[in-house]
UniProtKB/Swiss-Prot annotation:
This is Translation initiation factor IF-2. Residues 61-72 have a biased composition (Basic residues). Keywords: Cytoplasm, GTP-binding, Initiation factor, Nucleotide-binding, Protein biosynthesis. GO terms for molecular function: GTP binding; GTPase activity; translation initiation factor activity.
Length: 871
């Protein structure tokens, strides 16, 4: 049999040759170089020693230094190995028997009393791979009861030193036994790492199930062993292939030799590489899964244990074209859960950075004080809302407004009878619906102003609906009572039809006749407001952290981002750290509506604050927090969340919408860059411009923002074809004008919303295809057809209606059906050419390209008129 060199063993095991030499010398082999060769049995022993870190039985006598004291190896185990060797090597049977007898005599002389204890230890020794697999397959385990009083002690003896390296046949284990023991040891070590084994080691010990046990005579009370099912064995687990991979150097050595420890020898390994077996992973059933309200496709797939492609294909089958980064709405999540058969629990991920939800209002009754009421004035445009507030404030706001209409939300403080009242003035124009809705949502009482001479108008109805939706009390102020055409009864009747019944008519709504010009009824109106506020019992805690609503925000030169706020709870002071949506910062300065500096704003009061990092959205809730770090974290999380959501929306489209998108691609668009002075006006303008569209044209707002027109806006406009820059209540500076002139960018600025919308409508109308209409000119009857050589047919006609013009478009009509359309090629009156022939005259008409004229046909003359389209 071929010997195996040390470097081959090192290569097979992936070790350095020096390490293999050291391990071999530890076994007493005396290896000096990597080229030294050893027998296959010794190579197998080295392999076992390196893998298990345990010295093989056959080499214990070869070690010169005394080993650590260990219990003596069992005699029964050696006998089993010898018996197995006898079966597999019948030729060496006689020799093995003699050696077994000698070994037995030695064991009996050494210690005959240890036989019983050795049998007990035998149960703990590593079993062969076949035994372990079979016991696992049967699913049973023999449990040995614990007895604290019995402690098994094994006598130890010193191993005799031996200088001669002689490996007897009884000490040479077969390759199969060696590797089965080594593999079993590794397998046992791996099992010990698993968590479920730790709990079993406390009370049970596995016995050799293949040994002979009389299970029929087992008693649970008297006996030490109990047969129990082994729950660590899976029922569905299939027995794995017992064959283990052997080292290449063993296969090379015994490849051609039959009968070495195996019946029939070892089969030659095929050169063909075995096909890789793909282990089928057990699909775990997913129970109830927590899914965030806003989740991307790939995140949803990870949550439910599916591949992203599988989820996308399912969405495609449901009619949704998505990418893995798109967000899923609640309906899509529920449909997918039903398709995959998964129970889900939808949670709102935005709660993690919902600073409003985290805000804790202290409700200690001792700290609650009466706060100022917040009153919102609403109504139709030009019904006198701002004029009424001007009289109350003794100011002239209305006279300074562009176009005589309010285009911003204003907050003002008024003191009446030593009590403060906060007023919010909202625009009445239809474009400012969102502003009115915000005003109604943060107010305590709503005053609806109706002109006595004009009655209920569309925005009046809308304001009433906003107030009802907010659930706040309504007071009706009938304005312009000083006019001769004033008719308050008409107003009451119209409002009664909307279920706004006056108190004097048996209803529950207060009606007050006022005049913003003369001051009539103003005192009565304020008295009713304070009375209503007392009924509501408006209270707040001024000692807690501030909570306020932003009703308007803008950028002011020299001050940066400013915001008009109304404090709802707590006290907002200079130096407070605040967060509002994506904006955060420390309040650097505060002022009232008159521009007077303030140190604090109490509940129910309004003011203007400076110090935010950016322009906050109108309608956001502003909260005071403890630290700047906390405010920054809230704002950054909100910014990232909104950004990801916006990016996702730009890509998501359903199959049903795809056709509309393709059709929309044929639309002509007017690219617009929109800048305004405040956030509320910008919001209103965007909403109004987006409504200016039809099947042919639309407005495309490529950028919008609060503040003045900058050079970056000009650069963006120059990069976009045919785009214009629209400014509302702002003016470009000299540098910006020069840059726009150089780039050929047109800038238009306005201070009245009517004018801006009208100009955009005109621009859109110029881009639309003109409307083509027909204008009938005349009609002639053909009475004779003359064929002229080289020219064709000439029709002799009588003009019966209007005139026939040379070069005009004509239709040839036969029996009421148009048979030809073309142009007049020649027109003559007798022999002379004519430009036109009027009704009642005869003429000769030549039609270009027509040779099928008949007597009795009619020639109809017309012209096409183009009209400019408008929205």
């Amino acid at each position: 049999m071929a010997k195996i060199r040390i470097h081959e063993i090192a290569k097979e095991l992936g070790y350095d040759s020096k390490e293999i030499i050291e391990k071999a010398n530890e076994l007493g082999l005396g290896i000096k170089t990597a080229s030294n060769a050893v027998e296959p049995e010794i190579a197998a022993a080295i392999y076992e020693y390196i893998q298990t870190r345990e010295i093989p039985e056959a080499f214990k006598k070869n070690i010169k230094t005394p080993t650590a004291k260990k219990p003596k190896k069992e005699n029964i185990k050696e006998q089993e190995k010898l018996n197995e060797s006898e079966k597999k090597e019948p030729k060496k049977e006689e020799k093995l028997k003699q050696e077994v007898k000698k070994e037995e005599l030695k064991i009996e002389k050494e210690n005959a009393k240890e036989e019983e204890k050795q049998e007990i230890i035998d149960a703990h020794k590593p079993q062969s791979l076949a035994s372990a697999t079979l016991a696992k397959r049967r699913g049973l385990v023999i449990v040995k009861k614990k007895k604290d009083e019995e402690e098994i002690q094994v006598k130890k003896e010193e191993v005799k030193n031996s200088n001669d390296i002689s490996i007897n046949n009884e000490e040479r284990l077969s390759l199969k036994t060696m590797f089965s023991n080594a593999d079993e040891s590794l397998k046992k070590k791996k099992k010990e790492k698993k968590s479920f084994v730790a709990s079993k080691k406390e009370s049970t010990e596995k016995m050799n199930f293949l040994d002979e046990h009389d299970f029929g005579d087992i008693s649970l009370d008297d006996e030490d062993e109990v047969v129990l099912p082994d729950f660590s064995v899976k029922e569905q687990e299939k027995p794995q292939n017992i064959n283990k991979k052997q080292p290449n150097f063993i296969r090379q050595a015994v490849g051609n030799s039959a009968g070495f420890g195996f019946e029939g020898g070892i089969q030659r390994r095929s050169r063909k590489k075995p096909s890789k077996k793909i282990e089928k992973k057990e699909v775990e059933e997913v129970g109830s899964v927590a899914i965030s309200k806003e989740i991307r496709v790939y995140e949803f797939a990870d949550k439910i244990g599916k591949s992203t492609s599988e989820v996308i294909s399912k969405l495609f089958m449901l009619g949704m074209m998505t990418t893995k980064n798109d967000f899923l709405d609640e309906d899509a999540i529920e449909i997918l859960a039903a398709e995959f058969g998964i129970e889900i629990n939808i949670i709102n991920e935005a709660d993690e950075f919902d600073y409003v939800k985290d805000y804790e209002e202290e409700t200690d009754e001792k700290d609650l004080v009466t706060r100022a009421p917040v009153i919102t004035i609403m109504g139709h445009v030009d019904h006198g809302k701002t004029s009424l507030l001007d009289y109350i404030r003794k100011s002239r706001v209305a006279s300074g407004e562009a176009g005589g209409i309010t285009q911003h939300v204003g907050a003002y403080m008024v003191e009446k009878n030593g009590r403060k009242i906060t007023f919010i003035d909202t625009p009445g124009h239809e474009a400012f619906t969102a502003m009115r809705a915000r005003g109604a949502s943060i107010t305590d009482i709503v005053i609806i102003v109706v002109a006595a001479d004009d009655g209920v108008k569309p925005q009046t109805k809308e304001a009433i609906n906003h107030a009802k939706a907010a659930g706040v009390p309504i007071i009706i102020a009938i304005n312009k009572m000083d006019k001769e055409a004033a008719n308050p009864d008409m107003v009451k009747t119209q409002l009664a039809e909307m279920e706004i019944m006056p108190v004097e008519w048996g209803g529950s709504y207060e009606f007050v006749g006022v005049s913003a010009k003369t001051g009539m009824g103003i005192e009565d109106l304020l008295e009713i407001v304070l009375l209503q506020a007392d009924i509501l019992e408006l209270k707040a805690n001024p000692k807690s952290f501030a909570k306020a609503s932003i009703i308007e925000s803008s950028v002011q030169k020299g001050r940066g981002a400013v915001a008009t706020v109304i404090v709802q709870n707590g006290t907002l002071t200079v130096g407070s750290t605040v967060v509002a949506g994506e904006a955060y910062g420390k309040v650097r300065a505060m002022s009232d509506d008159q521009g007077k500096a303030l140190k604090e704003i109490k509940p129910g009061e309004c003011g203007v604050i400076v110090g935010l990092s950016e322009v906050a959205d109108a309608g956001e809730i502003l909260i005071a927090v403890k630290t700047d770090k906390e405010a920054r974290e809230y704002a950054n999380k909100r910014h990232e969340y909104n950004r990801q959501k916006e990016l996702s929306k730009s890509t998501k489209v359903s199959i049903d919408e795809l056709g509309a998108k393709i059709k929309e691609g044929n639309l002509k668009a007017l690219p617009v860059i929109l800048k305004a002075d405040v956030q509320g006006s910008l919001e209103a303008l965007k909403a109004s411009l987006e409504k200016l569209r039809n099947d042919e044209i639309k407005v495309n707002i490529i950028h919008s923002g609060v503040g003045g027109i900058t050079q970056s806006d000009i650069e963006l406009a120059s990069a976009s074809e045919n785009s214009i820059v629209l400014g509302f209540n702002i003016r470009p500076t000299g540098e910006v004008k020069e840059r726009a002139k150089d780039k050929g960018v047109e800038i238009k600025t306005y201070n009245v919303i009517y004018n801006l919308l009208d100009d955009v409508k005109a621009l859109l109308g110029g881009m639309m295809s003109p409307i083509i209409s027909e204008e009938q000119l005349g009609q002639a009857e053909i009475r004779q057809v003359i064929n002229v050589p080289k020219i064709g047919q000439i029709a002799g006609c009588m003009v019966t209606e209007g005139v026939i013009n040379r070069g005009a478009k004509i239709r040839l009509i036969r029996d009421g059906v148009v048979v030809y359309e073309g142009n007049v090629s020649s027109l003559k009156r007798f022999k002379d050419d004519a430009k036109e022939v009027a009704k009642g005259y005869e003429c000769g008409v030549g039609i270009e390209g027509c040779d099928d004229m008949r007597v009795g046909d009619y020639i109809e003359s017309y012209k096409e008129v183009e009209e400019q389209a408008s929205l």
